[in-house]
Curated annotation (Swiss-Prot):
Domain of life (superkingdom): Bacteria
Gene behind this protein: mecA
Domain notes: The N-terminal domain probably binds unfolded/aggregated proteins; the C-terminal domain interacts with ClpC.
Region of interest: Disordered: 118-138
Name used for this protein in its record: Adapter protein MecA
Assembly information from the UniProt record: Homodimer.
InterPro entries recorded: MecA_C_sf (IPR038471), Neg-reg_MecA (IPR008681)
Length: 240
């Protein structure tokens, strides 16, 4: 499980289904068994608290997005002063109610995991619509961006991913000692392949809210055109 501290009140995590199974849960547990789903969310909160000191204080806002390879969860604490003064018991009860509501809504939804992922892709597309107007118009180009915490993660991805993306334009940026990898898929690639590629990239990297506009303005391009092949050329595999 990868945990990213967004700010003082928000954490984001991505956990693969294989990792979920290693923790004693199944993929079906999350969407068809409310009791097991609750156990899973509470176990995640315990681990987040242990690693990031993210204590349940007041109500939380939870967003869950299902991907083909796993689940992305964003958890935010309330910034409302009155809510922050809730007792621990009331806060826990409200959090449990939110988890129950979240699971209930999921169980009532007959759409598949793939449908939910497609919705997520559409949400991202709409959220970046205003920023896309500022970029140079490139017909039918769709961009995927992920973040690596260090160079070792970049190298690991370059050697061990199984994506056929070498024919597409790609860029490796650096900003604040973090690495951002962008792939521009052209019109020959289906949305399903893009979705699958993104979920596989998240096995090595993290989601990011940084856009291409932001990276072009504030980050430095350190590699371009067949980035993974260049990384393999200049750096040995760190995992033998």
């Amino acid at each position: 499980m990868r945990i990213e501290r967004v700010d003082d009140t928000t954490v984001k995590l991505f956990i693969t289904y294989s990792d979920i199974e290693a923790r004693g849960f199944s993929r079906e547990d999350l969407w068809t068994n409310r009791k097991r789903g609750e156990e899973f969310f509470w176990s995640m909160m315990d681990e987040i608290n242990e690693e990031e000191d993210f204590v349940v204080e007041g109500p939380l806002w939870i967003q869950v997005h299902a991907f083909e390879k796993g689940v992305e969860v964003t958890i935010s604490k309330s910034k409302n002063e009155e809510a922050m003064n809730m007792s621990d018991e009331d806060a826990n009860e409200q959090f449990e109610e939110q988890v129950n509501e979240l699971l209930a809504n999921t169980l009532e939804n007959e759409e598949s995991i793939e449908d939910l992922f497609e919705q997520r892709a559409q949400q991202q597309k709409h959220s970046h619509k205003s920023e896309q107007k500022q970029t140079k118009q490139r017909p039918n180009i769709r961009t995927v961006i992920v973040k690596f915490d260090d160079l070792e993660q970049v190298i690991s991805y370059a050697y061990h991913h199984n994506l056929s993306t070498d024919e597409f334009e790609d860029l490796l940026y650096m900003n604040d000692n973090k690495y951002y990898y962008a792939i521009h898929f052209d019109e020959s690639v289906s949305q399903e392949m893009i979705n699958d590629s993104y979920s596989q990239m998240l096995e090595f990297a993290y989601p990011t809210d940084k856009t291409e506009v932001y990276l072009n303005d504030y980050a430095k391009i350190i590699m371009s055109h067949n980035v993974t092949a260049q990384v393999r050329r200049y750096f040995p595999d760190t995992v033998e």
